[in-house]
């Protein structure tokens, strides 16, 4: 069981790397400061590994004991938490959507807490408030500063200054990757530390190594989404984006607070897009999909972990029956709504009657 828990955690760490690749280097790649995906992913891998080893220990304490009592987390619970979170994150990576590992990990831990009725609700509310406030602050800050740039017509056109901006942007991207290592590796190794499988030092070392590997092997599609599909931006705007994300996440990590780096960066990019194109940026399908995935994902990992605990550890078949019924009812309601809308469009276009 211990080996299975470690393998689950390392698999999850690889998926963290894939998601963090877009969050940290998507800006530099999208602005043209670094043109090849492979180089961007290598720089990301080095940054996240360094961040995990140097400063990844503080958030571990929050993940391991700040949401549910530490003694609740056994090896079996570790497998359930990591498995539920990894499945949610892996699905998002296949869709090419940048997703916060903090969301799915906390969601999985909450599912265990709900099953055993040992949830620290006040701490959870604080964490969720950070999930809302930090991306909104990033969005508002980048929108406001970008508007100032455009109002005062601040532009850098000389090739020499453009090269300097490119170097500064790469440095900012590296520090954003560093912040990802500080904040997100704890999501993979925190449950292992709580269960006593690894100490903090070994956990961050092994976790950091596999996060770096995941960035190299699985990060291409998410990198493309953040770098090319949401909006276009200059090197100066890229520095603003990466600097904002790195600063917010590093400060949060120092205080041991898990925050959604992927959402911070993506929200900053949307802020730039809105400053340039207005509210039309929200009409892009990729933005709408991202917002939906962000909302659904923590509830998905919560539901998976809750069901696994109820099925294999508590044999609480009544709760499982209720959850399955709710899911079937929700799916049926969604399907019915789509059918009604389709019928109304058909009547509007072709006229009524049978």
Swiss-Prot record:
Inducing stimuli: Up-regulated by sulfur starvation and repressed by cysteine. Also induced by O-acetyl-L-serine (OAS), a direct precursor of cysteine, maybe via inactivation of a putative transcriptional repressor of the cysH operon whose activity is controlled by the intracellular levels of OAS.
Entry GO MF terms: phosphate transmembrane transporter activity
Membrane topology: Multi-pass membrane protein
UniProt KW Signal keyword: no
PANTHER family named in the record: PHOSPHATE TRANSPORTER
Annotated function: Involved in the import of sulfate.
Family under the similarity heading: Belongs to the inorganic phosphate transporter (PiT) (TC 2.A.20) family.
Protein known as: Sulfate permease CysP
Organism: Bacillus subtilis (strain 168)
Gene transcribed to yield this protein: cysP
């Amino acid at each position: 069981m211990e080996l299975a828990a470690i393998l689950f955690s390392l698999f999850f760490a690889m998926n963290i790397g894939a998601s963090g690749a877009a969050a940290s280097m998507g800006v530099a790649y999208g602005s043209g400061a670094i043109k090849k995906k492979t180089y961007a992913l290598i720089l990301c891998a080095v940054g996240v590994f360094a961040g995990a080893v140097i400063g990844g220990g503080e958030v571990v304490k929050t993940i391991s004991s700040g949401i549910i009592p530490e003694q609740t987390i056994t090896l079996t619970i570790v497998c359930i938490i990591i498995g539920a979170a990894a499945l949610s994150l892996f699905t998002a990576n296949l869709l090419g959507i940048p997703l916060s590992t903090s969301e799915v990990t906390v969601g999985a831990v909450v599912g265990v807490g709900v099953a055993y009725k040992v949830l620290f609700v006040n701490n959870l509310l604080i964490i969720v408030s950070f999930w809302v406030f930090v991306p909104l602050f990033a969005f508002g800050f980048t929108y406001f500063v970008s508007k100032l740039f455009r109002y005062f017509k601040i532009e850098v056109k000389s090739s020499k200054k453009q090269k300097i901006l490119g170097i500064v942007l790469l440095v900012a991207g590296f520090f954003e990757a560093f912040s990802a290592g500080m904040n997100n590796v704890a999501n993979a190794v925190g449950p292992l530390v709580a269960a006593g499988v690894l100490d903090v030092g070994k956990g961050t070392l092994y976790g950091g190594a596999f996060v770096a590997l995941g960035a190299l092997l699985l990060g291409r599609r998410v990198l493309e989404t953040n770098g090319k599909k949401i909006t276009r931006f200059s090197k100066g705007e890229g520095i603003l984006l990466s600097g904002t994300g790195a600063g917010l996440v590093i400060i949060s990590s120092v205080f041991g607070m898990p925050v959604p780096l992927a959402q911070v960066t993506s929200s900053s990019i949307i802020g730039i897009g809105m400053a340039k194109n207005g509210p039309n940026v929200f009409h892009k399908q990729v933005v709408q999909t991202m917002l939906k995935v962000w909302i659904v994902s923590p509830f998905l990992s919560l539901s998976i972990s809750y069901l696994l605990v109820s099925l294999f550890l508590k044999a609480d078949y009544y709760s499982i029956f209720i959850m399955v019924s709710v899911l079937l009812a929700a799916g049926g309601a969604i399907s019915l709504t789509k059918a009604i809308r389709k019928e109304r469009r058909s009547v509007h276009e072709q006229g009524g009657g049978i």
